[in-house]
A protein has these predicted regions:
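N-terminal intrinsically disordered/low-complexity leader segments
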Residues: 1-6
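Conserved segment of winged-helix/HTH DNA-binding domains
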Residues: 76-101
Length: 129
C-alpha cells in the first residue's frame, strides 16, 4: 500500500478497511484479518495495525472477540457512511468552497467541469432534502 505524507498511516489503513467493509469484502459480524495478516497485506509494522484496529473499535466499526479475532460490527456500513458524510460536509466541502473563492473559480467553470464528468443538469440542480 502506498501512503500519503499528509495523513497518519494508521488512519489511511482505517480508511482502506472501511472501504473494504463498504464494498462487502468484510460483511457484518464476519471476521477480518488478524493484526499480523493485515500488517503483512499492507506492509507495515503490526503495531500500526493494532493502532488502526483500536481506532476502528473506538468508532464501533469493528469489535474484538478475545482469543478469536476482530469482527465487523452490526451497522458498521451505516456508521462509516455517516462519519464520512459528516467529514465531507463539515471539513472537505467548506475547504472546497474556500478554494473556489481563493482561486476565483466561477460557477460557469464548475458547470463546465460537471459536464465533463457527465453529471446531468437535473442531478446538479436537484436539492437534497
Amino acid at each position: 500500500m502506498k501512503f500519503k505524507e499528509s495523513k497518519s498511516i494508521y488512519l489511511q489503513i482505517a480508511d482502506r478497511i472501511c472501504d473494504e467493509i463498504l464494498q462487502g469484502q468484510y460483511p457484518e459480524e464476519e471476521r477480518i484479518p488478524s493484526v499480523r495478516e493485515y500488517a503483512g497485506t499492507v506492509e507495515v509494522n503490526a503495531n500500526t495495525v493494532v493502532r488502526t484496529y483500536d481506532y476502528l473499535q473506538g468508532l464501533e466499526i469493528i469489535y474484538n472477540k478475545r482469543g478469536i479475532g476482530y469482527f465487523v460490527s452490526t451497522g458498521a456500513k451505516e456508521r462509516i457512511i455517516t462519519l464520512r458524510k459528516d467529514t465531507f460536509l463539515h471539513e472537505d466541502l467548506p475547504e472546497f468552497f474556500r478554494q473556489l473563492k481563493t482561486l476565483e473559480i466561477s460557477m460557469d467553470e464548475i458547470d463546465k467541469m460537471l459536464s465533463l464528468i457527465h453529471i446531468s443538469e437535473p442531478t446538479r440542480l436537484r436539492r437534497i432534502s
